[in-house]
Curated annotation (Swiss-Prot):
GO terms for cellular component: mitochondrial inner membrane; mitochondrion; SAM complex. Ubiquitinated by PRKN during mitophagy, leading to its degradation and enhancement of mitophagy. Deubiquitinated by USP30. Belongs to the metaxin family. CDD domains: GST_C_Metaxin1_3 (cd03212), GST_N_Metaxin1_like (cd03078). This is Metaxin-1. One of its GO terms (biological process) is mitochondrion organization. Keywords: Isopeptide bond, Membrane, Mitochondrion, Mitochondrion outer membrane, Protein transport, Transmembrane, Transmembrane helix, Transport, Ubl conjugation. The lineage of its organism: Eukaryota, Metazoa, Chordata, Craniata, Vertebrata. There is a cross-link at K38, K41, K78, K168 (Glycyl lysine isopeptide (Lys-Gly) (interchain with G-Cter in ubiquitin)). Ubiquitous. Higher levels are seen in the kidney as compared to other tissues.
Length: 317
């Protein structure tokens, strides 16, 4: 008997089954199709077989990490939400997927990862509290830099060199995109009628994050909340497909203090050694990945003196 497929994705929060755009899209598609997956929700990407989230481990042990490729594999396994779509609807799916990536995704990245107030009070706060130590000290900042690079690639076609003008242009296009989605949805349950398709999984993941997060700076969020059919659309999908999901990451259980036994010193020593081993592994990873670099000082300094330079920006709250 073949091993079951396994999906590794980011944990839930803000009333959503996952706080990550890609993880939420894949999770939603699997609920639409009823794909039999063993789902691992985690706030530690190192628990994924690829070291990234989301990731699908197939029944033959292959690991797939790109959301589009994960969905393509599920289609090959006969879990196809687009099976009944016409050729015209298939073309519309491609057009709206491009619209989401070009017009809405850049502003979502800006809203959650670039806007200083939102990043500090919402995004970094969630990841820093959810991630295990010591990942929570450097990984949110590393993710932010990756999203900055992704945003630069997405905005390559925009000619404005003024940052304020560029931001204004991006938000205007995102508002137009939301309005167009609202008009296309109309009074339907889903974008192509009464049954959900892959487009619904991606639209929902983009809208739900923006709708559910409590953002101190929510310019686009205010526009979305004014489009009542899109809000009802998100609520309908959450209630129908994720009725028991979306809780915040549970806090570690507090166990009552027990009297110290003869084995307690040995247990403590084992715990300390485990922590030290974990820290050593983290430092090794940081050195290999370039997060931390060791630079030799100039000859003018005393022999043997070294300078430890942090290659990444400070992650202090």
């Amino acid at each position: 008997m073949a091993a079951p497929m396994e999906l590794f994705c980011w944990s839930g929060g803000w009333g959503l089954p996952s706080v990550d755009l890609d993880s939420l899209a894949v999770l939603t598609y699997t609920r639409f199709t009823g794909a039999p997956l063993k789902i691992h929700k985690t706030s530690n990407p190192w628990q994924s077989p690829s070291g990234t989230l989301p990731a699908l481990r197939t029944s033959d042990g292959k690991v797939i990490t790109v959301p589009d490729k994960i969905i393509t594999h599920l289609r090959k396994e006969k879990y196809n939400a687009d099976y009944d779509l016409s050729a015209r609807q298939g073309a519309d799916t491609l057009a709206f997927m491009s619209l989401l990536e070009e017009k809405l995704l850049p502003v979502l990245i800006h809203t959650f990862w670039i806007d200083a107030k939102n990043y500090v009070e919402v995004t970094r706060k969630w990841y820093a509290e959810a991630m295990p130590f010591p990942l929570n000290f450097f990984l949110p900042g590393r993710m932010q830099r990756q999203y900055m690079e992704r945003l630069q690639l997405l905005c390559g076609e925009h000619k404005s060199e003024n940052e304020e003008e560029l931001e204004k242009e991006l938000y205007q296009e995102a508002r137009e995109c939301l309005t167009l989605l609202s008009q296309r949805l109309g009074s339907q349950k889903f974008f192509f009628g009464d049954a959900p398709a892959s487009l619904d999984a991606f639209v929902f993941s983009h809208l739900a994050l923006l709708l559910q997060a409590k953002l101190p700076s929510g310019k686009l969020q205010a526009h979305l909340r004014g489009l009542h059919n899109l809000c009802a659309y998100c609520t309908h999908i959450l209630n129908l497909y994720f009725p028991r999901d979306g809780d915040e990451v549970p806090l570690p259980r507090q166990t009552p203090a027990a009297p110290e036994t003869e084995e307690e010193p040995y247990r403590r020593r084992t715990q300390i050694l485990s922590v030290l081993a974990g820290l050593a592994a983290m430092v090794g990873y940081a050195l290999l990945s370039g997060i931390v670099s060791i630079q030799r000082t100039s000859p003018a300094r005393a022999p043997g003196t070294r300078a430890l330079g942090l290659a990444e920006e400070d992650e202090e709250d």
